[in-house]
């Protein structure tokens, strides 16, 4: 009864007011799966292609009617009659039919929406929650954990209209005993941060990922105000709550230098910027740094890994773009020690699971992540639990596109109880 009988694609709106692709997969037994593709702002150059129409008279060129047409046309034709439970087979048909290295014919947004909708339909057909089905697809049935959230409470870079160069300043409630408690701790710090910023006469408007986006005197000041908020909330920094950053350094890499415009155009070499970050880790309990250099600066990353890699988690996002070919090369060259996992960078569930497995097999951690352009689709919560990835990045404590994922984690934890432990600090590379 898990035979696909109908596939529907449609254009919906994401959290930035831009169109994205939503797909429905209908099965013979009456079960339906529905999923939407997210969209990034700071994107790696080697990501799978997000197909946009380019018609400036409609959605400023960002329409996705071509990708939707691919779902309703060739993809639907190829998949009708196939077994939804064969996720790898379904994804392979779409990838082969597209025939390009970066999914540029149909768009990764089209293929991913169908891939995830198919997984949801198959889970429904099997009478199980999505996380349980994902664990089976992953070859790890019944093995779950609740992820430590990385909560992006100060937004900068491409995610905010402010003068802060580093894109994300995050808290990790590592001292919590459950994900529900971790979310409460994050919420309390978030609200205390608003009070701290207001007391300093700073803006408390939020950025794309729901964190505050004030103008600050320096990148270090973001860490200082967060430290103040953690203390005001009654928590101990470094014990109850640790810090993480996403530099998204490719966004301020210009002519071979790392230029911090918000700090008077200070320019750094790869080595100098590594030591700039190292100093911050000495001043604050920063346990994870993502994209600490430009995605193409592999020599710099090798140096950064040598300097910081045995002390903290170094996460590759633009660096690896959830791509097993690139990750394999990084593992062989000893670049970073963790990978950020974003479905739409690679464009299918099967390839996403392959990247998580490769990372884990090599002793790298995997951090499951949203994109800055999101929808109410909470699939990443199920992915994090179903692969026992251990960490999740899904924004701050505001905007329902972010909070939807936290609420799903609360529901999953309630359902699984002790079968899905919250392991806190030991999930983070170098912190066990």
From Swiss-Prot:
EC supergroup of this enzyme: lyase
Which superkingdom heads the taxonomic lineage of this protein's source?
Bacteria
The main location is cytoplasm
Enumerate the UniProt keywords alphabetically.
Cytoplasm, Glycolysis, Lyase, Magnesium, Metal-binding, Secreted
Q: Any idea where this protein resides? A: Cytoplasm; Secreted; Cell surface
Its pathway, per UniProt, is: Carbohydrate degradation; glycolysis; pyruvate from D-glyceraldehyde 3-phosphate: step 4/5
Q: What is its EC number?
A: 4.2.1.11
Q: Which GO terms describe its molecular function?
A: magnesium ion binding; phosphopyruvate hydratase activity
Q: Which reaction does it catalyse?
A: (2R)-2-phosphoglycerate = phosphoenolpyruvate + H2O
- Where is Mg(2+) annotated to bind? 246, 290, 317
Name the InterPro entries for this protein: Enolase (IPR000941), Enolase-like_C_sf (IPR036849), Enolase-like_N (IPR029017), Enolase_C (IPR020810), Enolase_CS (IPR020809), Enolase_N (IPR020811)
Q: Which SUPFAM superfamilies match?
A: Enolase C-terminal domain-like, Enolase N-terminal domain-like
Cofactor (UniProt): Mg(2+)
Its job: Catalyzes the reversible conversion of 2-phosphoglycerate (2-PG) into phosphoenolpyruvate (PEP). It is essential for the degradation of carbohydrates via glycolysis.
Q: How does it assemble?
A: Component of the RNA degradosome, a multiprotein complex involved in RNA processing and mRNA degradation.
The protein depicted here goes by the name Enolase
């Amino acid at each position: 009864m898990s035979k696909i009988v109908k596939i529907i694609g449609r254009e919906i709106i994401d959290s930035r007011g831009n169109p994205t692709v939503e797909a429905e997969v209908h099965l013979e037994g009456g079960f339906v799966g529905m999923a939407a593709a997210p969209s990034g702002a700071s994107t790696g150059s080697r990501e799978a292609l997000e197909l946009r129409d380019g018609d400036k008279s409609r959605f400023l060129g960002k329409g996705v009617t071509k990708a939707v047409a691919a779902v309703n046309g060739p993809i639907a034709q190829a998949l009708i009659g196939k077994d939804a439970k064969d996720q790898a087979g379904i994804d392979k048909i779409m990838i082969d039919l597209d025939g390009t290295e970066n999914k540029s014919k149909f768009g990764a947004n089209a293929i991913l929406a169908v891939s995830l909708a198919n997984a949801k339909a198959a889970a429904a057909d099997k009478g199980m929650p999505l996380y349980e089905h994902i664990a089976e697809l992953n070859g790890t049935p019944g093995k779950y954990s609740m992820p430590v959230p990385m909560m992006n409470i100060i937004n900068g870079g491409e995610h905010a209209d402010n003068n802060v160069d580093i894109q994300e300043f995050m808290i990790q409630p590592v001292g919590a005993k459950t994900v529900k408690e971790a979310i409460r701790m994050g919420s309390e710090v978030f609200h205390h941060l608003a009070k701290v910023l207001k007391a300093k006469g700073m803006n408390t408007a939020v950025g794309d990922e729901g964190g505050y986006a004030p103008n600050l005197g320096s990148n270090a000041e973001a860490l200082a105000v967060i430290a103040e908020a953690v203390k005001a909330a009654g928590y101990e920094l470094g014990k109850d709550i640790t810090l993480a950053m996403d530099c998204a350094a490719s966004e301020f890499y210009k002519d071979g230098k790392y230029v911090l415009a918000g700090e008077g155009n200070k320019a750094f070499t790869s080595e100098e910027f590594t030591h700039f970050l190292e100093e911050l880790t000495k001043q604050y309990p920063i346990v994870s740094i993502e994209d600490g250099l430009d995605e193409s600066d592999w020599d710099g990353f090798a140096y950064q890994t040598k300097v910081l890699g045995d002390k903290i988690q170094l996460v590759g996002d633009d660096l690896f773009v959830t791509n097993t070919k690139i990750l394999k090369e990084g593992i062989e060259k000893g670049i970073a020690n963790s990978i950020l996992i974003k479905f739409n960078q690679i464009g299918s569930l099967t390839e996403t699971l392959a990247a998580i497995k490769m990372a884990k097999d090599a002793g790298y951690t995997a951090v499951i992540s949203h994109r800055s352009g999101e929808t109410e689709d909470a699939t990443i919560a199920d992915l994090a639990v179903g692969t026992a990835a251990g960490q999740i990045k899904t924004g701050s404590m505001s905007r329902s596109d972010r909070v939807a994922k936290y609420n799903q984690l609360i529901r999953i934890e309630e359902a699984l109880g002790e079968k899905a432990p919250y392991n806190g600090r030991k999930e983070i590379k170098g912190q066990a």
